[in-house]
Design a protein with these regions (language model features):
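Structural transition elements
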Residues: 280, 312-346, 364
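Gly/Pro-rich hinge or "lid" segments in bacterial periplasmic/extracellular proteins
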Residues: 162-215, 220
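Surface-exposed binding/hinge segments that line
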Residues: 85, 89, 96, 130-172
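Detector for C-terminal structural segments
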Residues: 29, 297-324, 363-372, 394-506
Length: 506
C-alpha cells in the first residue's frame, strides 16, 4: 500500500493506496472486478437538480458526467466540455463540447442537452440551484458550442459545473419526468436495478462504449449506505466494503486492525446559529448572545479529546487554503466562560436561555453532548433535536431549528461556500438572514478579481466571525480508512474523492 503527500499552496493533496475487498472476501491486487464503497448516507433522488452536496457525489458520478472536473488540488480542467472561456467582463462563458458522447438511452450529448440540463438546474432545490441563478440564458451556438449569459460574474461557476450543476442527464429522460427514480446519464456506469436495494446497496455495471473508460477501471461499483459510523467500520473490517469516511476516534483502532489511515484537511464542524434575526429564538437575535456561545466553547480541549488532535481549532467556515482565510481570526473567541456569562447578562439573559439545536444522528451524536455541556456551563440549555438522516422530512427538521450542528464541506473557490450558506436563498440559510455588509460584499466580490477580490473575501470572513453568524469548533482532518488492495488519490476541498481516482493497487 502506497502513501504519498504532495504539497500545494497551503494544503496537501494526499495520494494514497487504500484498502479493498469485494462482497464478502478479500480482493487481490490488480483486481478490477469490483469496487465497494461505504457511504455516509442514502440517496434521496437521482435528479441532479435536487441533489444536495456532500456524500452523494459517488452516486452521481457513477451515472452522470460533469461538464468540467476537478483535479486533486481542486483546479478545474475539461471533461465533457473540452474548452471553456469567459469574455472580458466575465458575464459570458463559452463551452466547447465533445462530439463523441451519448447518454445511456442512446440520446446524443450536444449543446441542446446542455441547455436543457442547465435550465432544469435553475428550477431545482438542490445544491446546484444557487449557482444556477446567475445563468440568465443558455445560448446554443451550434451542436458543440454553448454560451452561458450571466446576470453578473460568478467566481464559483466553474467549480459548480464540475459537480452538481454540471452533471448531464439525458434530456429525453428529463422530459419524461422519471429522472428522480431512474438515472439516465452519459457516465461510466449503469444502475443495475436487479442488484440494487434502496438503503442497503446500489450496484452499478460498467457501461459499454463509454468514452473515458480508462479513467474508471472497475467492472462493477457497489455503494453501501451507512448512517452510523460504527456499522460502517464493522463493514470495512469484515470485508463488506473497501473504503470509508471515518472519524478521528477510529484512528488508533484502525491502525491496530491493520487498516490504512489517511487524512486530508477538510470540513468544519460546529453550530450554524441561523436564527440571527431572533424569529424563533429571540436570544440569537442579539450578537452578544452569539458571541457568548462562541466564548463558551473550549475548542482546544474538544480538538484534543474528540478529534484526537486531527485538525485545527477554528472560528471560520472557509477552507484554510481559500482566499477568504484569515489565520488571526481563530484567536477571536478564546475559551472564556466568564466572558460568555458577562455577554449573556449584558444581552438581558443573566439566567441563560433555552436553545433548540438539531443535529444529524450518527454523524454528530458524539459531539453534541460535549457542546451541550459547555453551553450549559454558561447558562444555555440545549434542547436536542436529533434527525435520523435527511429522508422523510429529516432535512427540513434539521434546517427548521434556530441552530443546528452538522459537518460542512469547505470549498475552493470560497464562493461555493458563499452560495451554500450566506445568501438569503442558500440551502443552509433556512431563515434567509442577511445584513447590509454581507449584501454589499456579495455584490462586490464577483465583480472583483485577484488581490482586490481576496481582500473582499477576507473582509466578509472577518464580518461573519465578528458578528458570530456561526460557532465553528474545528476545521478537522477528514479521516479515510481502507485496506491495501486499491489505490485512491484524495482530493483537496472535496468530502469524497471522485470515482475516477479509485484504481486497483499495482
Amino acid at each position: 500500500m502506497k502513501l504519498n503527500r504532495t504539497l500545494t499552496a497551503a494544503l496537501a493533496a494526499v495520494a494514497l493506496a487504500l484498502a479493498g475487498c469485494s462482497g464478502g472476501g478479500e480482493a487481490a491486487e490488480g483486481d478490477t472486478s469490483q469496487l465497494v464503497l461505504g457511504n455516509n448516507g442514502d440517496l434521496l433522488t437521482w435528479d441532479p437538480a435536487e441533489m444536495k452536496e456532500g456524500a452523494v457525489i459517488h452516486y452521481a458520478e457513477a451515472v452522470y458526467d460533469p461538464l468540467l472536473r476537478k483535479t486533486p488540488e481542486s483546479k478545474i480542467e475539461p471533461n465533457l466540455a473540452t474548452e471553456y472561456q469567459y469574455n472580458d467582463d466575465l458575464t459570458e462563458l463559452t463551452l466547447k463540447l465533445r462530439d463523441d458522447v451519448t447518454f445511456s438511452d442512446e440520446t446524443t450529448f450536444d449543446a441542446e442537452a446542455v441547455r436543457v440540463n442547465l435550465e432544469a438546474r435553475k428550477k431545482g432545490a438542490g445544491s446546484a440551484s444557487e449557482a444556477a441563478r446567475v445563468i440568465e440564458r443558455v445560448e446554443v451556438v451550434d451542436k458543440t458550442t454553448v454560451k452561458l449569459h450571466l446576470s453578473e460574474p460568478s467566481p464559483g461557476l466553474l467549480a459548480a459545473l464540475a459537480t452538481y450543476l454540471g452533471y448531464m442527464a439525458s434530456p429525453k429522460a428529463l422530459a419524461a419526468g422519471g429522472i428522480a427514480t431512474t438515472p439516465v446519464g452519459s457516465g461510466p456506469y449503469l444502475l443495475d436495478p436487479g442488484n440494487t436495494e434502496k438503503g442497503v446497496r446500489y450496484t452499478f455495471t460498467s457501461r459499454e462504449g463509454y468514452w473515458n473508460r480508462d479513467a474508471f477501471p472497475f467492472e462493477t461499483v457497489v455503494i453501501r449506505p451507512y448512517e452510523e459510523f460504527t456499522a460502517r467500520y464493522n463493514a470495512l473490517t469484515t470485508g463488506q466494503i473497501q473504503f470509508m469516511y471515518g472519524t478521528p476516534d477510529m484512528v488508533p483502532k484502525a491502525k491496530a486492525d491493520g487498516l490504512t489511515v489517511a487524512t486530508v484537511p477538510g470540513e468544519w464542524q460546529g453550530i450554524i446559529l441561523q436564527d440571527r434575526a431572533g424569529k424563533a429564538s429571540p436570544a440569537l437575535g442579539d450578537v452578544r448572545v452569539r458571541q457568548a456561545i462562541n466564548h463558551a466553547l473550549d475548542r482546544k480541549a474538544i480538538l484534543d479529546t474528540h478529534y484526537g488532535g486531527l485538525g485545527q481549532v477554528s472560528t471560520q467556515t472557509f477552507n484554510p487554503a481559500s482566499e477568504a482565510w484569515v489565520p488571526s481570526l481563530n484567536e477571536r473567541y478564546p475559551y472564556d466562560p466568564a466572558k460568555a456569562k458577562e455577554l449573556l447578562t449584558a444581552a438581558g439573559y443573566p439566567n441563560g436561555f433555552k436553545l433548540k439545536v438539531s443535529f444529524s444522528e450518527g454523524f454528530m451524536s458524539p459531539l453534541v453532548p460535549i457542546v451541550a455541556q459547555y453551553l450549559a456551563d454558561v447558562g444555555v440549555t440545549v434542547e436536542q433535536v436529533p434527525v435520523n438522516g435527511f429522508a422523510n422530512g429529516g432535512l427540513e427538521t434539521l434546517k427548521g431549528q434556530p441552530a443546528f450542528m452538522l459537518s460542512f464541506s469547505t470549498n475552493i473557490p470560497a464562493w461555493t461556500d458563499v452560495l451554500n450558506k450566506l445568501t438569503p436563498t442558500s440551502l443552509w440559510n433556512n431563515f434567509q438572514y442577511t445584513d447590509d455588509t454581507v449584501t454589499r460584499l456579495l455584490r462586490e466580490i464577483p465583480a472583483a478579481q485577484g488581490d482586490q477580490q481576496a481582500a473582499l473575501y477576507k473582509e466578509l470572513n472577518t464580518h461573519l466571525v465578528e458578528h458570530a453568524w456561526f460557532a465553528p469548533i474545528v476545521t478537522q482532518e477528514n479521516v479515510y480508512l481502507a485496506k491495501p488492495e486499491i489505490d485512491v488519490t484524495m482530493q483537496q476541498a472535496q468530502l469524497m474523492p471522485s470515482l475516477r481516482f479509485f484504481a486497483p493497487a499495482k
